[in-house]
Amino acid sequence: MSRGQSLQDPFLNALRKERVPVSIYLVNGIKLQGQIESFDQFVVLLKNSVSQMVYKHAISTVVPARNVKLSSNEGENIHPIGGTRSADAD
């Protein structure tokens, strides 16, 4: 498994399990919102009023509505990841 997959899969899985609302920005600038229902190597199923299959190669950014904690694998540290920040958080 590549390093990219070893972060991507636990991140998406945590968002799915915890049913965290997400904003997904596509490479063409379109913003999609919903909850991650499922995912595989190539696609993400995003559920809102309808389910949408979004190809990963079209995704630029996944922004969770709140932080999620990733499970520790092979002794790695657990780090909160994601969430939105206010403009005055700097």
Curated annotation (Swiss-Prot):
Record domain Sm: where: 9-68
Top-level taxon of the source organism: Bacteria
Keyword check for Acyltransferase: no
Cellular compartments per GO CC: cytosol
Keyword RNA-binding listed: yes
InterPro entries the record matches: Hfq (IPR005001), LSM_dom_sf (IPR010920), Sm (IPR047575)
Family under the similarity heading: Belongs to the Hfq family.
Subunit structure, interactors included: Homohexamer.
Protein name: RNA-binding protein Hfq
Organism (species): Nitrosococcus oceani (strain ATCC 19707 / BCRC 17464 / JCM 30415 / NCIMB 11848 / C-107)
